Amino acid sequence: MAVEEIHAEMVSSVWKVLVEPGSAVAAGDTLVILESMKMEIPVLTERAGTVGELHVVEGEVLQEGDLIATVVDGTTAPSRG
């Protein structure tokens, strides 16, 4: 079973969380939306599966490299964009 770890690519704030642990996701689905320098940055999953763990909450400030979520291969869902 493969696990995708999704990390913050820059210092940012968690603006909106769109999934929860156990949510089925398709490749390309948006998991959370970050905000940095007044820009909204969608964080996407690269694989279909199930959200295993969610490590952020709305309003939290992230540093580059912080773990946002894990996605476990398996359950798939239609893309929600």
Protein language model annotation of sequence segments:
Residues 1-13, 30-46, 79:
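Short beta-strand-turn/beta-hairpin segments enriched in glycine/proline and small hydrophobics
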Residues 5, 11, 18-19, 40, ...:
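Generic alpha-helical hydrophobic packing signal
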Residues 22-31, 36, 59-68:
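A structural signal for short beta-strand/turn segments enriched in small hydrophobics and glycine
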Residues 54-81:
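C-terminal structural segments of small proteins and small subunits
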Residues 16-20, 24, 53-56:
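Short histidine-centered loop motifs in beta-beta connectors
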Residues 19, 36, 41, 56, ...:
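Short, conserved catalytic or interaction motifs in soluble domains
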